[in-house]
């Protein structure tokens, strides 16, 4: 993978989280494999490459890549507006989080506890989802900027769906942080669209 493709893999994680949040909000449904991929990404430390963060291959990132391609191509027929809004909001929240050492410390202390739950129950277990959602509430929900999720109120009011949405937003912001660490910047999404798409199309085909 090229350095830009490493960035795009992490950005695909942001967009996958956004797509899954939108799907839960509108339908109440989510793929367990995709959910496990994103929640698992919270717990990987010192990966040998970006792909390892998402389980070693990018098959679960396809929907994230597709939404990212739609955003970069700016084609109204393929643009997923709500996921794009969520993804950009996650990139913005990551910038705010980076300035808050206290919140980063809280996240750093509680992720090992969640890791213990994953080892006991598995990554998509309701206890793990609730713990991740609670961590989001205690940290990122306290920031000035909030992510407003739109969908069917019947889905949004179910506690299990609310926990999944918060857990996915936490995982998406983790991917946004990884994207920044790999050299990603928001201006690239405007200025370097064609360059990004050229590197992204092969990822979409191979995943």
UniProtKB/Swiss-Prot annotation:
Coiled coil feature spans: none
Keywords carried by this UniProt record: Cell inner membrane, Cell membrane, Cytoplasm, Membrane
Pfam name, any one: DUF489
Membrane topology recorded in Swiss-Prot or TrEMBL: Peripheral membrane protein
A cellular component annotation (GO) from this entry: cytoplasm
Main subcellular localisation: cytoplasm
Record flagged with keyword Cytoplasm: yes
InterPro entries, sorted: HflD, HflD-like_sf
Sequence intervals crossing the membrane: none
Top-level taxon of the source organism: Bacteria
Annotated compartments: Cytoplasm; Cell inner membrane
Family, as annotated: Belongs to the HflD family.
HAMAP family: HflD_protein
Protein name: High frequency lysogenization protein HflD homolog
Naturally occurring in which organism (per UniProt): Pseudomonas fluorescens (strain ATCC BAA-477 / NRRL B-23932 / Pf-5)
């Amino acid at each position: 993978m090229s350095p830009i493709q490493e960035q795009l893999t992490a950005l695909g994680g942001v967009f996958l989280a956004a797509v899954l949040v939108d799907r839960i909000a509108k339908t109440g449904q989510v793929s367990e494999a995709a959910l496990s991929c994103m929640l698992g990404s919270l717990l990987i430390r010192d990966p040998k490459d970006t792909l390892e963060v998402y389980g070693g291959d990018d098959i679960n990132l396809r929907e994230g890549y597709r939404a990212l391609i739609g955003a970069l191509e700016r084609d109204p027929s393929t643009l997923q507006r709500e996921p794009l809004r969520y993804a950009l909001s996650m990139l913005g929240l990551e910038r705010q989080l980076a300035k808050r050492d206290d919140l980063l410390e809280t996240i750093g202390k509680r992720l090992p506890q969640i890791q213990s739950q994953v080892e006991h129950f598995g990554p998509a277990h309701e206890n793990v989802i609730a713990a991740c959602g609670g961590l989001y509430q205690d940290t990122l929900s306290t920031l000035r900027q909030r992510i407003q999720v739109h969908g069917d109120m019947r889905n949004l009011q179910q506690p299990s769906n609310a926990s999944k949405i918060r857990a996915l937003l936490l995982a998406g912001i983790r991917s946004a942080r990884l994207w920044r660490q790999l050299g990603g910047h928001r201006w690239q999404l405007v200025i370097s669209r064609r360059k990004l798409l050229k590197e992204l199309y092969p990822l979409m085909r191979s995943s």
